[in-house]
């Protein structure tokens, strides 16, 4: 039976419906906000595995073109592989949900939110998140919900919940917040140099709406009726010889956990693991059934040692204090042929960023259901296996897309608009080493690379990854976390920004008791760390270079009247093609009359600009052109001044010193219609014979008259008068 629940969030109602679509799934919910609707389903496999130490969850958010009344572009007229946007939304759904599933369930879980309709006003991603969370909460799969999500923006001094696309575009802060009744579990977004207090207020305000949606889900569960939960596949087991393992390895492990250097530390811990494994195997205390329990017990000891040292002694595995940042080395211009490059090294994390400048032809065209877009700024993040000393395939996965998107958001508010810098900008980050915070190293390297390339950015941007170790009311915030601290800690949040404020933010919280005071302390510690990193980066490069690389395409811009665009294009594009071929330039003509020329030769580009200016310029008496003889008749020749203008050159004999008084030609003909370019006729020194003209010949002419109908009369100009 169809069940419906409605609640007001922001300017529209959020509507949940179930019991009439996808009824064979373990759970299904159709969520609607405004005119945007998403159907979310959740299913689990019937196969049970007891050897899993993780939650086998997959989220496949997908958008259908029919939702916006569109047919896919290109040759293939159906939806294909997931777009970056769909992957990013899938990650937004996955991250707050994954910790709430029980590992002991032992079955593969798949959540599929499908966008069925969009009104081009309300973004469907938030609708999809709440549809997915509610579908799982209503299902028979064990889940520690409810959770919910909202988007908050800061616009004109006010916070707006679940804003429109236009409000998002115009805002100074745009974040997606997910959480439960007890607290926040995930935050992600970008900003235009906002302060920490604004971010905190946005998160705090978002939680109030999240609690409303969570309570609505509980009410909806009462309406629909609770399903009997599926049984857990296995009970959590403990290695039966855990105490003996502790006695055997704990003291040595405490030393191994604090060996300097990631590779050395990993090697020392692995040696102890192998030694312990061999010892217990020799005692015949290890079997196939408890081998995984042995490794879990060993990992628990390592986690206990590291967390205890941080909480009680303020000492981290690499010897740093909680707020200490690793040594930083920065370089720029290390690649000679690229348009801009920078190498940023922080401890054992290293990122090489390379900036390339292109033309408007290089813009990325986004064919999305919320409207076609053209991106002129892109950041691509690569994480090759050698960065962590491993082998593997070179491929772009969801992690790479997510990290690249975070770094791009951190930098894009500092990148100038197309009107100020009409280049397409692509930044590629190659992570060469990784031991935590590679996405924030990408932000730092990317910022310096943009400056190296001469992109007039508004300010230098740095990023830092923060962590948290807590126990009860006691907590320690960590600056510039290592990979193991991310894994063993209670919170991972990344903050990027300038000296003036935050530009990018991502936070994942594994515990529920994160207070506002704790978050304020963490953000302040992150701000201090960010300023420290910026000070080091600024010693290498603090402002954008004046001018761009000699290897980058050159740009010349000019503005013409809109009604003259057709003159520049010409019949069937003939005129603009001639300019392109003759001067070896690319010509971009915009609807507002702005013309952008791209090329490699400054001289040819200037000549192309002059040609366009001559095409659109209104002719005036006295101006000189180099024209082409197009047609000759018994009275004279028609001279093409520009592809859109012709003048007439009379070939009749004229007195060399004739004056035209008040006649049609006025007093502008100083010598003759031929400007002295003809020859005297024998026996008639006062008359001049016109020079011989041929069609296609290039000659210099001067405008001597323009009548009221726009007809242009010309005379030949001698070289010395030109």
From Swiss-Prot:
Catalytic reactions on record: RNA(n+1) + phosphate = RNA(n) + a ribonucleoside 5'-diphosphate
UniProt keywords, alphabetically: Cytoplasm, Magnesium, Metal-binding, Nucleotidyltransferase, RNA-binding, Transferase
Naturally occurring in which organism (per UniProt): Borreliella burgdorferi (strain ZS7)
Cofactor list: Mg(2+)
Protein localization: Cytoplasm
Gene Ontology terms: biological process: mRNA catabolic process; RNA processing
CC terms in the record's Gene Ontology section: cytosol
GO molecular function: 3'-5'-RNA exonuclease activity; magnesium ion binding; polyribonucleotide nucleotidyltransferase activity; RNA binding
Pfam families: KH_1, PNPase, RNase_PH, RNase_PH_C, S1
Similarity comment: Belongs to the polyribonucleotide nucleotidyltransferase family.
Matches recorded under InterPro entries: ExoRNase_PH_dom1, ExoRNase_PH_dom2, ExoRNase_PH_dom2_sf, KH_dom, KH_dom_type_1, KH_dom_type_1_sf, NA-bd_OB-fold, PNPase
Residue positions binding Mg(2+): 486, 492
EC code: 2.7.7.8
Primary location: cytoplasm
Domain KH per the UniProt entry, residue ranges: 553-612
UniProt protein name: Polyribonucleotide nucleotidyltransferase
